[in-house]
């Protein structure tokens, strides 16, 4: 190998650093995939990250998805910035559902009132994405309504407990029928 090729190889060494954005569940950071390999490639101690993340999120209900930014420094240390839970988490919790609609626009997965949307907007307005750009609360509300639509959640003006309970019972029947249809389709496909 010539001196020139060795010199260029030493110049092209990748510099450790950068930002990794990910959604990690509170108290559930583990050394395995998906974050383990990414941090390992950057030379960051995976066990140290898991320990620090789980320590910082110990006061938060376990399993809540948290947007996380990991700033990797050139000396291969890191700095964590943990955001608030995602809008979809808040909307699904307010609607009392686990998943959004399978066919958005054709089915309604849940119901939330404008009061719920306003409360979520008040919390998310403090988030970096909105606070840094000085976004007015009305725009945050519209953004959350758009997210609700994409999840198949209908936003209604007022919502009583009885209306919500009736909707959830109707939705449970619909999901059971949908699951039966899926199982029948799988059985039919297996026969072929």
Curated annotation (Swiss-Prot):
The keyword Chaperone does not apply. One of its GO terms (cellular component) is mitochondrial large ribosomal subunit. This is Large ribosomal subunit protein uL11m. GO terms for biological process: mitochondrial translation; translation. Its main location: mitochondrion. It comes from the Eukaryota. It is found in: Mitochondrion. GO terms for molecular function: structural constituent of ribosome. Component of the mitochondrial ribosome large subunit (39S) which comprises a 16S rRNA and about 50 distinct proteins. Disulfide bonds: none annotated. It comes from Mus musculus (Mouse). InterPro entries: Ribosomal_uL11, Ribosomal_uL11_bac-typ, Ribosomal_uL11_C, Ribosomal_uL11_C_sf, Ribosomal_uL11_N, Ribosomal_uL11_N_sf. Pfam families: Ribosomal_L11, Ribosomal_L11_N. Keywords: Mitochondrion, Ribonucleoprotein, Ribosomal protein, Transit peptide. Belongs to the universal ribosomal protein uL11 family.
């Amino acid at each position: 190998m010539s001196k020139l090729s060795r010199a260029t190889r030493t110049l092209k060494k990748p510099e450790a650093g950068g930002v990794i954005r990910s959604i990690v569940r509170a108290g559930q950071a583990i050394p395995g995939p998906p974050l383990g390999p990414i941090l390992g490639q950057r030379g960051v101690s995976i066990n140290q990250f898991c320990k620090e993340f789980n320590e910082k999120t110990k006061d938060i209900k376990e399993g809540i998805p948290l947007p996380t930014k990991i700033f990797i420094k050139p000396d291969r240390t890191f700095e964590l910035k943990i955001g608030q839970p995602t809008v979809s988490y808040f909307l699904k919790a307010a609607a009392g559902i686990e998943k959004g609609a399978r066919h958005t626009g054709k089915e309604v997965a849940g119901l939330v009132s404008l009061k719920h949307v306003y409360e979520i907007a008040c919390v998310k307005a403090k988030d970096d994405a909105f606070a840094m750009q000085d976004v007015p609360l009305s725009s945050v509300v519209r953004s959350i309504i758009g997210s609700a639509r994409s999840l198949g959640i209908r936003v209604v003006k007022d919502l009583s407990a009885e209306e919500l309970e009736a909707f959830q019972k109707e939705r449970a029947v619909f999901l059971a029928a949908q699951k039966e249809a899926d199982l029948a389709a799988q059985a039919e496909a297996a026969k072929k």
